[in-house]
Amino acid sequence: MTTPVLQTLHRIYPRAVIDMVVDKRSRDLFVHCPYRGELFEKDKQAFMRGFPRLVFRLARKRYRLAVDLRTDGLLCLIRAGKKLGKWNGDASATHAVEKHLSVVRTLAGDKSVYHCCLWPGDEDLSFAGRMLEQVKSKKTLCIAPGANAAKKIWSWKSFRELINRIDRDFDSVVLLGSRRDRPIAEEITAGINLQALNLCGETSLLQAAAILAHASLFIGNDSGLGHMAAAAGAPTCTLFGPGQPEKYRPWGDAAVWLTGRNRQVNDISVDDVIRHLELNRLLA
């Protein structure tokens, strides 16, 4: 949810390259960003060793501007002509994207609201083309059945029923996620009529992004894939349980969401989802 900030900075400083502090998993998402500079990896698993190494590398450079949207102390250790942190933002902003953008708007009063974006490379686009050639679909439904916690995962039985009830609107369904999501995806595909492509555990993040760019609709739990789908331009419907959609829902004009009663994702019924999709004109 930080890419709108990158786009704002690029508009203000079109000739600048932007160094970024990233974690191991998100690093690949920025490799093909056309205005990126150096990527500094933050090792969350080895904090005591990794943080001093990160600080040492950053301290060797001097910046015109340093922006920190997440931590409280890293800016103190970076040499920069100007520094902006969370305290420069609008405390009343609700969504994380709006809060992040409010930090850098102090630079030029820019009121533009950029969408999140992704930069898949040529190899990622070719991979997506090869995979989707298997289903030869004009209208693809993408499903992400997993999440990073069991309490965020909608029942595979509900996903299966939902797909069967809306399958007239699609030619195929592609399932995306990690390798641990694959058994759930197999349960779903075992009982559906649509031609299915189970790619759980078979893609990198950018390969998944390239596939999501072809989706006619994305439906998934509260996970990173929902944010990627919205950034790729797909209409999205995210199912929330204990999360905070007002702060962390996918960002985009065609991104909708539902929250289960009492913050329980499995209190969302299939009927609830279909009504919500129809209300938001995401079904034909």
Regions found by a protein language model. Name each.
Residues 1-284:
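Catalytic machinery of carbohydrate-active enzymes
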